[in-house]
Swiss-Prot record:
Stated family: Belongs to the periviscerokinin family.
Protein name: Periviscerokinin-1
Subcellular location: Secreted
A cellular-component GO term for this protein: extracellular region
InterPro entries linked: Periviscerokinin
Taxonomic placement: Eukaryota, Metazoa, Ecdysozoa, Arthropoda, Hexapoda
UniProtKB keywords: Amidation, Neuropeptide, Secreted
GO biological process, one term: neuropeptide signaling pathway
Role summary: Mediates visceral muscle contractile activity (myotropic activity).
A family per Pfam: Periviscerokin
Residue list for modification Asparagine amide: N11
Stretches of the chain forming a coiled coil according to its record: none
């Protein structure tokens, strides 16, 4: 799940 950046699998 992305936290605000691009689209990471975690964070």
């Amino acid at each position: 799940g992305s936290s605000g950046l691009i689209s990471f699998p975690r964070n």
